[in-house]
């Protein structure tokens, strides 16, 4: 089975980073000020914290890959170069994950290009999950609980 793992809101705490830096728009509630994010460049992404429970869960998923139980990939959407660079820097600083297995697409919907009957996507957003499922892939919605998410992965492996 191929397991594709989102980054923002799944592995890394995007909301905490935006909040810590005060990068919310003043004119619209709960909207990110992308001009500020882009002005900060790669550092915005590279300096994010792990989301609660993600570091241990990621280590378990990597161990499962080493045992040949699954193929693990990062599948993250970002539409500007400094964001891609920052996400790569984050992976290099915080993991031993091979950058060749990190895939970056422009839009969340583009993740559906990787959908297949043996492919699973863990993501926190419907705008990524729904197109992936519609394209024939399998989805696990991340709801902030890595223990439950890992249980869902193990359950999915037993189905294959």
Model-assigned labels for residue ranges:
Residues 1-45, 134-135, 147:
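Active-site neighborhood of HAD-like aspartate-dependent phosphohydrolases
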Residues 6, 75-77, 122:
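Short hydrophobic segments within beta-strands
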Residues 12-14, 20, 68-72, 81-85, ...:
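Short catalytic/ligand-binding loop motif for oxyanion handling, primarily in non-cytosolic enzymes
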Residues 48-50, 54-91:
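Substrate-recognition element of Asp-dependent hydrolases with the DxDx(T/V) motif
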Residues 73-82, 88, 96-113:
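A short, structured active-site edge motif that brings together acidic residues
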Residues 86-96, 131-135, 153:
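Short, aromatic/basic amphipathic alpha-helical patches
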Residues 102-132:
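Conserved Lys-Pro-Asp/Glu-containing loop-to-beta segment of HAD-superfamily phosphomonoesterases
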Residues 120-153:
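Acidic, Mg2+-coordinating phosphoryl-transfer loop and its flanking beta/alpha structural elements
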């Amino acid at each position: 089975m191929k397991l594709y793992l989102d980054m923002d809101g799944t592995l890394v705490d995007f909301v905490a980073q935006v909040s810590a830096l005060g990068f919310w728009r003043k004119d619209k509630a709960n909207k990110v000020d992308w001009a500020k994010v882009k002005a900060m460049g790669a550092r915005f992404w590279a300096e994010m914290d792990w989301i609660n429970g993600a570091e241990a869960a990621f280590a378990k998923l990597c161990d499962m890959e080493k045992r040949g139980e699954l193929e693990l990939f990062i599948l993250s959407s970002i539409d500007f170069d400094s964001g891609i660079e920052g996400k790569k820097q984050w992976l290099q600083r915080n993991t031993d994950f091979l950058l060749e297995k990190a895939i970056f697409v422009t839009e969340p919907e583009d993740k559906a290009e990787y959908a297949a009957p043996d492919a699973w996507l863990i993501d926190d957003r419907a705008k990524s999950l729904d197109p992936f499922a519609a394209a024939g892939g399998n989805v696990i919605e991340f709801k902030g609980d890595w223990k439950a998410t890992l249980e869902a992965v193990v359950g999915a492996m037993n189905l294959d």
